[in-house]
Amino acid sequence: MEWNDWHAHIWRGKAATVARAVIPTGFRDLDRALPGGGWPLGALTEILADGYGIGELGLLMPALAALTKEDPAKPKKWVAWIAPPFIPYAPALQQHGVNIDRLLMIHPTSGGKNRLWAIEQAVRSGSSVGVLAWVAAADADDIILRRLQLAAEEQGCWVLLFRPANARLQRSPAALRIHLSQAQSATRVEIIKCRGGRPDVVDVAGFALDGAASQASSR
């Protein structure tokens, strides 16, 4: 799906008063389970898991490929990766159609506050079409999550936070919260919270479980 196609692909939640844009996940069953058929843009999404390398990156590859595709008619924007726990394996990303020249790796100095500050700045800068960030459960409280949700809405940015599964116990203003786990040869996606939708469970197959991190080096 081309940039103009998915950018115009909108939905209205049951309680929504404005149209919301989405970007298709690239996986039919998951698109069917999400309002409008994709990841919500201009919103905060939380991806919860017990660990890394269980399909979290493979699940994002189609969307990342679409977001990083060059379009001469549009200004260049970045997809920022903040504090990834691994060094992404460039050949795997390219194999999935991701333009690695549009990826920006950011490694803040140690400390949860520095990391959260970097995330918010990346979203508010207006130069990022997407922000992927890895944070600990204890580092992000309701206040900062609301700030990120608001910043995402203002900038129309696709913001994803990767958090440990125990963050599920915390309240969150995120438009979408999902929990990932392994299910035989698939990645199980449990939709915990979905604005304009309802909880669901979808098994997604068809990509390597450890995706672009399969040959990554730990940091």
Which sequence ranges carry the predicted segments?
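Detector for small/aliphatic-rich hydrophobic stretches
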Residues: 1-81, 92-101, 197, 218-219
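Helical mechanochemical/support elements of P-loop NTPase systems and associated helical scaffolds
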Residues: 26, 56, 89, 115, ...
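Conserved RecA-like P-loop NTPase ATPase core
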Residues: 30, 47, 103, 131, ...
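Localized chelating/binding microdomains
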Residues: 51-52, 80, 113-117, 157-158, ...
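Short, charged/polar "capping" segments at the starts of alpha-helices
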Residues: 55, 86-91, 168-169
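Conserved inter-motif catalytic segment of the P-loop NTP-binding fold
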Residues: 75-129, 134
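P-loop NTPase motor core
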Residues: 108-178
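Phosphate-binding/switch region of NTP-binding enzymes
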Residues: 159-219
